[in-house]
């Protein structure tokens, strides 16, 4: 019967992988000293009477390490896109050039870099908590299965060990992603 429970573990592993992926998406929105199109992924624009993501009304490119270009397809939303970028908490000031926005990426101050590292740490900690909650859910489900005599006590212990290994792997991925992002942020 243990083989019937194996998919349960893969389901929890998938959830943990999604938590790590979510962290990487959060990190993409954190500004570093270099330009990245991912920096603008979270920006929502008030266009056509509703809030839409920036990439649905424009194409984003990075021609230089310290500049982002936004090519807006409809002239009518240029001011809305500019306003959305300016009002974001990224501290960017776009320059309008017809249908294009040129966004210079100013170098970060040492203080701002340290703040960004703290924010990245908070993101990472939130995902670690999410991973641990998934582990708790998995262990609870395994204990319920053991109580219902679906799996034996030995299988329970074996599967709990496997869940812990999966959890350790996910936590390690979070730590590695955080370390990489910290290095990226602190790089001058």
From Swiss-Prot:
Keyword vocabulary terms for this entry: Cytoplasm, Protein biosynthesis
A GO term from the CC aspect: cytosol
GO biological process: cytoplasmic translational termination
CDD domains: RRF
Entry keyword Magnesium: no
Record localization: Cytoplasm
Chief localization: cytoplasm
Function per UniProt: Responsible for the release of ribosomes from messenger RNA at the termination of protein biosynthesis. May increase the efficiency of translation by recycling ribosomes from one round of translation to another.
Similarity-based family: Belongs to the RRF family.
Protein name, per record: Ribosome-recycling factor
Source organism per UniProt: Caulobacter sp. (strain K31)
């Amino acid at each position: 019967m243990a083989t019937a429970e194996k998919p349960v573990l893969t389901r929890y592993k998938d959830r943990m992988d999604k938590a790590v992926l979510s962290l990487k998406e959060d990190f993409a929105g954190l500004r570093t000293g270099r330009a990245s199109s991912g920096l603008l992924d979270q920006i929502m624009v008030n266009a056509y009477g509703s809030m839409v993501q920036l990439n649905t009304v424009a194409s984003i490119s990075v021609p230089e390490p310290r500049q982002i270009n936004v090519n807006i397809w409809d002239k009518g939303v240029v001011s809305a896109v500019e306003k959305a970028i300016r009002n974001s908490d990224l501290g960017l000031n776009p320059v309008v050039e017809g249908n294009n926005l040129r966004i210079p990426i100013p170098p970060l101050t040492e203080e701002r870099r340290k703040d960004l590292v703290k924010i990245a740490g908070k993101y990472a900690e939130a995902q670690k908590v999410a991973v641990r909650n998934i582990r708790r859910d998995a262990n609870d489900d395994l204990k319920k299965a053991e109580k219902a005599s679906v799996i034996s006590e030995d299988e329970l212990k074996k599967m709990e060990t496997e869940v812990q290994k999966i959890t350790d792997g996910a936590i390690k991925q979070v730590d590695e992603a955080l370390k990489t992002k910290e290095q990226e942020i602190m790089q001058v």
